[in-house]
Structures are given as C-alpha cells and as structure tokens.
Curated annotation (Swiss-Prot):
NDH-1 is composed of 13 different subunits. Subunits NuoA, H, J, K, L, M, N constitute the membrane sector of the complex. It is found in: Cell inner membrane. It comes from the Bacteria. InterPro entries: NADH-Q_OxRdtase_suN/2, ND/Mrp_TM. The gene is nuoN. This is NADH-quinone oxidoreductase subunit N. It is an enzyme of class 7 (translocase). GO terms for biological process: ATP synthesis coupled electron transport. The chain crosses the membrane at residues 8-28, 35-55, 71-91, 105-125, 127-147, 159-179, 203-223, 235-255, 271-291, 297-317, 326-346, 373-393, 408-430, 455-475. It catalyses: a quinone + NADH + 5 H(+)(in) = a quinol + NAD(+) + 4 H(+)(out).
Amino acid sequence: MTITPQNLIALLPLLIVGLTVVVVMLSIAWRRNHFLNATLSVIGLNAALVSLWFVGQAGAMDVTPLMRVDGFAMLYTGLVLLASLATCTFAYPWLEGYNDNKDEFYLLVLIAALGGILLANANHLASLFLGIELISLPLFGLVGYAFRQKRSLEASIKYTILSAAASSFLLFGMALVYAQSGDLSFVALGKNLGDGMLNEPLLLAGFGLMIVGLGFKLSLVPFHLWTPDVYQGAPAPVSTFLATASKIAIFGVVMRLFLYAPVGDSEAIRVVLAIIAFASIIFGNLMALSQTNIKRLLGYSSISHLGYLLVALIALQTGEMSMEAVGVYLAGYLFSSLGAFGVVSLMSSPYRGPDADSLFSYRGLFWHRPILAAVMTVMMLSLAGIPMTLGFIGKFYVLAVGVQAHLWWLVGAVVVGSAIGLYYYLRVAVSLYLHAPEQPGRDAPSNWQYSAGGIVVLISALLVLVLGIWPQPLISIVRLAMPLM
C-alpha cells in the first residue's frame, strides 16, 4: 500500500510523538539534563496537539487496514495528549527531589502516549492489541519508578503479572473470534457476524475472553483487584496517567469496536456487561467509603466511574446520544482527575519518600493553602456529580441514555452509586476546612500557583466550573467527532 502525503498528515500526532521519543532517547544518551528532556517532551506533546488541526483539515480516512483517522480518533487522541502533557508537567517538580535517573520517566510517558494514540485510531483487533501493549509496558516501569520504596516495587510487580495474564486472555479471545469470523478488522467483523452467528459458542467464548482482558485494563469488577494497590504504590504523577490516559484510550477503542462490530446485539454479552457495570458501580463506591488514603479512594472511585461509562456502552445500539454521553463524561472525568491527582502531586513534590496520600495530610489545608483547597473541593464536587460542575453534565447524560434505552436497574445503580459517592467525596472536601493539625505533615510550596503544575491544576478547575455552567462548547466538539464515524 502506498502512503500518500494525505496519509502522513492524518498520522501527524503519532509521527510527532514517535519522533519526540527518538529525540529524547538520543538526548539522554548524549547528556543527562532533566530540564532539557522535560522541555523536549512537553514541546513534542504540544506539537502533536496542535497537529490535530491539520488532521481535521485532511478529513476522515482509512490510513492502513489497521487504522482509521476521523473525528472520533481526533477527540480521543486529544484527550490522551492532554493527560500525557499534564503527567509530564506534574512529574517535573516531583522528580527534582528524586536521586536516581530522572530522564527515563519522560521517555516512558511518551511511549505510553504513543500507545494511547494508536488505540484512538485503531480499526483492527491487531492494532487494538498493539496499542494496549504499547500503553501497558511503559506503565510497568512507571508504576515502580520509585523502586527504593517497597510499596512502589510491589505495585509494579502486581501490575506486571496481572497485566500479562489479562493480555493472554485478550489474545486468546481474539484468536477464537478470528477462527469463527475469518477477519480481525472491525468493519469486516460487522459484516461477517450476522444475527445468527453472534450466538455461536466459539464466538461468545472469544468475546467473553476479550471482555476479561479489557475488563482488567479498565479495572472493572471482578477484574479490579490490582487497582487500589497500584494507585497507592505508584508515584502521584503516574497515578494521574493510569487514571486518565490509559482508561480513556482503551474505552475509546472499545466504543469503536462495539460501534462497527455488533457485539452488543448479543443478549448474552449485554447481560454480562450489565452485571459487570452494576457490580462496578456499587462495589467501587462501597469500597471507597472506608478509605483513609486519597489515592486508594480515587482508585476505587475510578472503578465506579468506568461502571457508569459501561451503562452508555450497553445503550450504544439505541442511538448516537450514548456516544455523545461517553465523550462528555470522559472529558469531565479527565479534567476532574487531573485536578485531584494534580493536587496530590503538588503536595508530594519534590520527592521525599512516600507521597502525601493520607487524608490526614489534607486536614485543614484551607487555612494555609486556600486556593489549593478550593481547587480540590471543586474536583471532589465534580467527581461526585454536583450541579454547576462538568461531572454533573456527564452523569446527567449517562442517566438520560440509560432511561432512553430502558436500562432501569442500571439507572437505579447509577443513582444509588452517586448517592454513596457523595458521602466520601464530601468527606474529603470537608476535611480540607477542619482545624489544621498542630504538626502539619507534607505541604505544597508557597508559590505553587506559579509553577507549571499549579497552572495545569488551576486551568482544570476553571474548565470544570465553566463547562459545568456552559457545556455547549464541549458538546459541540464531541458532536463534531460523531458524524465522521
């Protein structure tokens, strides 16, 4: 197949991030300079973001049989790049206090971002698997980056072993699907899988095994066991990437698979997904209730958020509104998570051993860092789905989609889960305004709002509030991505 200039323009974000990986690698080999390599990484990610405008001008196209570049791919590529950019920004002050090699951190984040972009463009089960591996493998190193801490090393080993097991399930499931359908392309799967074929035992087994593999990557119940330990053990900037970029990219490709290949038409698969969604919403929220570690709390809450998104995925067959719901919800989840994990990163920077992740560390934060406490409050309210925040718009969309598709018991689960979530999110918010302890522990630098990480956190808070009050610009962007499907 001949690659035309149009194809190259369509692949610009992927090519720019790939080039940045090579440049940073050569820079590290030539001379270790933390500031230089961080700057090169941020410039590369910003250039990839800007290049999305040129990709939009080129229009939708199938670049190779493995990749389709369209509005949908651009939306999810943009979200992954924003999450990667924020991760690098939060990592810089954290790494300033880190005594071992700093520069490889950015290299691993860039490679993981490359995997996320590949997933956003994937149109074939082969590129889906390649993208998932490309985003997972660097995370093994990132999770255990603070390897002198027992907890970080333990989290890395857990994630590596369980991720390898999940990948084997995913690969075996794909093999069974290929054996039955004779093709791995999403579009060809849609053509080959007629109504009768979807109930073939081999095909059901194949998709079942794929759900196990993808369920692990998205930390859905009952494949969630790694989530709280890994979120707690990983450095705060890495937890940011885990909670945002990896989840968004993988959920995006699952959406495309369900859109082209009518997997959701099978009643058996719909029932399994509904049970997983119900269990994830209820279990994730109930387990978060008793947490005293903010990273574990956010880990369990991410399980419930993916459960809410699964409701929209199950309703995908009922119309375009569910695609819109997922886009808006993921944007809200991205900015809220960036803000929440950003505050934890600022409190934990520079590296001085374990992160400031105990809830006690945030008690009375308002009295010495009022703006930071206000930012954290906004993020908690958004994650809880309180009106006037972007989180509310996303949750309202999910409820509307659930009602439209008559998924009544899942709508009930969303309502109950949101009520439980309200308690533990407000518990975090209230603790920020209590009397500060006499001997405060970790604290953010006094000039945090002038640092790059502080600016990212403030912008996230502003977007959560502004788009919560006036969501039309975001909804318009998400709708632009839909007709090109």
